[in-house]
């Protein structure tokens, strides 16, 4: 009876610990990818994200990038990701993917966030984002909050 309880306790602890392990290996992969990006690469990722968003049908007409620009950006990022996954972070990729096949997707989400953060470091971008406030009726908003 005691040995059955021990086996059950071990199985439960393994089930509880497995997600933590896969999460930490996913975090390690994400951190490795981010840590191995230099400033130029971060800016290139930001440009790539911008081009990708510019493909949206509602905003495509505002996009000034040429198909050649987009292709060059795609090619650059493809080679960058290949380097990150096969050279800089290959061991972490293997560990993370083995414990959680979704780890690669999660790591790419982090890379996307880094690209967006790069865009948001620009004072011009932050000013442009805040421009809507000139047209918001803050008195009406304040009234709702009181």
PLM regions and their residue ranges:
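Bacterial N-terminal signal peptides that target proteins for export
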Residues: 1-8
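N-terminal secretory signal peptides
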Residues: 22-72
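Repetitive helical segments and hydrophobic/amphipathic motifs
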Residues: 11-15
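Compact alpha-helical subdomains of small soluble proteins
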Residues: 53, 57-63, 67-146
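Terminal, compositionally biased segments
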Residues: 7, 23, 142-146
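N-terminal signal peptide c-region/cleavage motif recognized by signal peptidases
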Residues: 17-19
């Amino acid at each position: 009876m005691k040995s059955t309880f021990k086996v059950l306790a071990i199985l439960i602890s393994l089930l509880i610990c497995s997600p933590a392990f896969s999460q930490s290996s996913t975090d390690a992969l994400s951190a490795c990818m981010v840590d191995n990006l230099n400033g130029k690469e971060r800016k290139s990722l930001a440009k790539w994200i911008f081009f990708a968003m510019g493909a949206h049908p509602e905003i495509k007409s505002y996009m000034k990038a040429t198909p050649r620009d987009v292709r060059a950006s795609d090619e650059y990022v493809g080679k960058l990701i290949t380097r990150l996954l096969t050279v800089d972070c290959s061991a972490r990729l293997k560990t993370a993917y083995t414990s959680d096949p979704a780890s690669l997707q999660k790591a790419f989400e982090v890379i996307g966030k880094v690209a967006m953060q790069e865009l948001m470091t620009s004072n011009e971008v932050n000013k442009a984002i805040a421009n809507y406030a000139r047209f918001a009726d803050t008195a009406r908003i304040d009234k709702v909050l009181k």
